[in-house]
Amino acid sequence: MLLKMEEMVIEKKNEMKQTGDFVSGVSKNGEYETAVALEKQEDLKTTSKSLIELEEEKQSKEKQLKSELLKKKLEERPKLDNLEDLQTIINLKKRKRVKKVKVPVVKEPEPEETIGDVDQMTFFKAALDNKMSIIEKYLADGGDPNTCDEYKRTALHRACSEGHTAIVEKLIEAGANIEFKDMLESTALHWTCRGGSVETLKLLLNKGAAINARDKLLSTPLHVAVRTGYYECGEHLIACEADLNAKDREGDTPMHDGVRLNRYKMIRLLILYGVNLNIKNCAGKTPMELVMQWQNGAKEIFNGLQNKSYKNSHISKF
């Protein structure tokens, strides 16, 4: 028995010695940190195993709890023992649908703007800005629809230039003079052709506006339409038998203006309706001669540029 005890003590001492040798060896070789790190990793492995087991237990408990709750809900559901139970469920669903329906929000009408006294300048601005309520207020208060500024431009001229047809109609109904001329002797029809509104043009012609009225330059509304390039206005004037060959103060017809300004569509339109191409202006030029003159001028410019470039290239060689 004593021998066995001694053997056990000796064996224990040997184990302790081996452990001491290992630690001292590790310290000597500078690998102590590595050994500790390995120990920690082993410790983490054992710890992670225990954590996994705990997590699995937690999940199983949660699943069990969910299944119990679901079972409870199923038990609490109303059973369809008869038709009355079914009708109750249908009524409940209908109520839910009614709750989901959104009630449309009805906007309250905005309060009408109270308009005070309208002076002359406000009246003119309203004609430009298409403010019907201000126009109506001015006229209702007895304002003169033919009042004009220092350039003799009326509210009708302004409304026509902007194409505010409703304002134009209101002013004419109130007694505005369609043939009233401004300082340059332009009528409402001239101003309409500067603005390009066909609807306003039709309204004025239907109200009896002079289709061949002349301004200070003796230009007709067709002259103005060709110069500004408003094709539909020009087409409607021609369809209403405007004078195709009317001459202005320089003797130019609408065709002369079209050629000079290179209004291709207008030129084609005038030719289609039978314009006279042989009429000469005060300079003695027909529309065709103006085209040739322009072409010759263009040729001279290009020839001059060509000669200049030739000389420059010839000089650069030396």
From Swiss-Prot:
Keywords: ANK repeat, Coiled coil, Nucleus, Repeat. It holds the Pfam family Ank_2. Residues 37-77 form a coiled coil. One of its GO terms (biological process) is regulation of transcription by RNA polymerase II. GO terms for cellular component: cytoplasm; nucleus. It is found in: Nucleus. It comes from the Eukaryota. This is Ankyrin repeat domain-containing protein 1.
